[in-house]
Curated annotation (Swiss-Prot):
Motif Polymerase core binding: where in chain: 61-74
The keyword Mitochondrion appears for this protein: no
Native species: Priestia megaterium
Entry function: Sigma factors are initiation factors that promote the attachment of RNA polymerase to specific initiation sites and are then released. This sigma factor is responsible for the expression of sporulation specific genes. It is responsible for directing gene expression in the forespore compartment of developing cells of Bacillus.
GO-annotated biological processes: DNA-templated transcription initiation; sporulation resulting in formation of a cellular spore
Keyword Ubl conjugation belongs to the record: no
A GO MF term: sigma factor activity
Record-given protein name: RNA polymerase sigma-F factor
Family note: Belongs to the sigma-70 factor family.
């Protein structure tokens, strides 16, 4: 396990409202908030990776891809949803890994991240000697002509994850472990419940298209709005209505 992850092991875990506050700041361009979200959710990414361990891929490679899914979920999360971030993020991370496996041979993200991580490590050493202190993410990014996001992603992707039995979140004193998040408690897989396939079948064609574009094609609300010829606000309202309808359907099953 990475030294920094060990160091963070005994730190209190973020509650859902704290995560959402960080997401809000991140979506407004706060890089520190974005870095914190990634740091605090590394265990969540690793828990998802466990589902794909025996498919012939290196766990570290899948972890790197999962980090990309995590960052996408931060960017796309709608704070108006009455849903925990972890509930939204896990399917996004799973989807990113599944796409990587499906497109293997054409997408070489893991290799490029490893190469980038090596460059970043060397750059940090050089800048530390030059500045007499540890350089910031922005300084490393500027030195290598990268974006701050690329630097953070490469650094986090190379950090070793921790146990899936550790608590990820505590909601009103109720601890939630990684295993709780992804375990198959019934014959139906956890992700199938998140996808709500049966509930989707109850939607009309436009609603199905919105779900498909948002959650299977990773399109933003603005992109969906352009596709449907309506406003982003309308898409947001429709999406909330759809999610509520699907949730009710699941509760009745």
């Amino acid at each position: 396990m990475d030294v920094e992850v060990k160091k963070n092991k005994n730190e209190p875990y973020l509650k859902d409202h704290e995560v959402k506050d960080l997401i809000k700041r991140s979506q407004q361009g706060d890089q520190i908030a974005r870095d914190t979200i990634v740091q605090k959710n590394m265990r969540l990414v690793w828990s998802v990776v466990q589902r794909f361990i025996n498919r012939g891929y290196e766990p570290d490679d899948l972890f790197q891809i999962g980090c990309i899914g995590l960052l996408k979920s931060v960017d796309k999360f709608d704070l108006s949803y009455d849903v925990k971030f972890s509930t939204y993020a896990v399917p996004m991370i799973i989807g990113e890994i599944q796409r990587f496996i499906r497109d293997d041979g054409t997408v070489k993200v893991s290799r490029s991240l490893k190469e980038m991580s090596n460059k970043i490590r060397k750059a940090k050493d050089e800048l530390s000697k030059l500045l007499g202190r540890v350089p910031t993410v922005a300084e490393v990014a500027e030195h290598l002509d990268l974006t701050p996001e690329e630097v953070v992603l490469a650094q986090e992707a190379n950090r070793a994850p921790s146990s899936i039995h550790e608590t990820v979140y505590e909601n009103d004193g109720d601890p939630i472990t990684l295993l709780d998040q992804i375990a198959d408690h019934t014959e139906a897989k956890w992700f199938d419940k998140i996808a709500l396939k049966e509930a989707i079948e109850e939607l009309d064609e436009r609603e199905k298209l919105i779900v498909y574009l948002r959650y299977y094609k990773d399109q933003t609300q603005s992109e969906v709005a352009a596709r449907l010829g309506i406003s982003q606000v309308q898409v947001s309202r429709l999406e909330k209505k759809i999610l509520k309808q699907m949730k009710l359907h699941m509760n009745d099953t």
